[in-house]
Design a protein with these regions (language model features):
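Hydrophobic, proline/glycine-rich low-complexity stretches
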Residues: 1-57
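Internal, well-folded beta-alpha domain core
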Residues: 13, 71-164
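A glycine-rich, hydrophobic loop/mini-helix early in the fold
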Residues: 38-42, 51-94
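Short, charged/polar low-complexity linear motifs in solvent-exposed/disordered segments
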Residues: 45, 52-54, 63, 101-104, ...
Length: 164
């Protein structure tokens, strides 16, 4: 089994997932990545959450490693291995963004993010791209689709025109 690189704790997570046109999504992906589908349908997800206790495999949790994040992702395959492809990654942590851009070439950008949860009302505000308010009936919904979306342990990126 491969060594993990980064460990992190997620809290206040919300997955807002919706079907998208396969051909439209395919046209927005790097050529070497395949659109992964669930029951023949392609999906995008908007995922706001709070990340904390970030650490590399050789370090304790890093100081000042709590941040809010908002990402737009889709689900892909590379050489038949399922993974995630990020279109955008917004975070309110300038140093974290800089390091993620430089070390992992991820498309992080700085945003002023506000994530609030009051009972079943989830409110997300981003100065870059989004104002979202969702009322949730059941906070823990497990379906075949939610398992397909969340049980992915690989992210793909393009560096120097190669999949990494």
């Amino acid at each position: 089994m491969a060594q993990w690189i980064i460990q992190q704790k997620w809290s206040d997570v919300l997955f807002v997932s919706f079907e998208v046109d396969y051909d439209l999504l395919r046209s927005e992906l790097p050529k070497d990545l395949e659109v992964d589908t669930f029951n023949g349908k392609a999906y995008l997800s908007i995922v706001p959450f709070v990340m904390s206790d970030i650490r590399f495999f050789f370090t304790p949790p890093l100081p000042f490693s709590k941040l809010s994040e908002l990402n737009l992702r889709t689900y892909v395959r590379y050489k038949n291995k399922p993974g995630i492809y990020f279109f955008t990654l917004d975070s309110d942590h300038r140093l974290g963004n800089f390091l993620a851009q430089k070390i992992f070439n991820l498309p992080y950008r700085y945003a002023i993010l506000d994530i609030n949860i009051d009972n079943n009302l989830y409110n997300v505000q981003s100065n870059n791209s989004l104002s979202l308010e969702v009322r949730i009936k059941d906070k823990k919904i497990k379906t075949d689709l939610s398992n397909w979306i969340t049980e992915r342990y690989c992210l793909y990126n393009i560096i120097d025109e190669k999949v990494s």
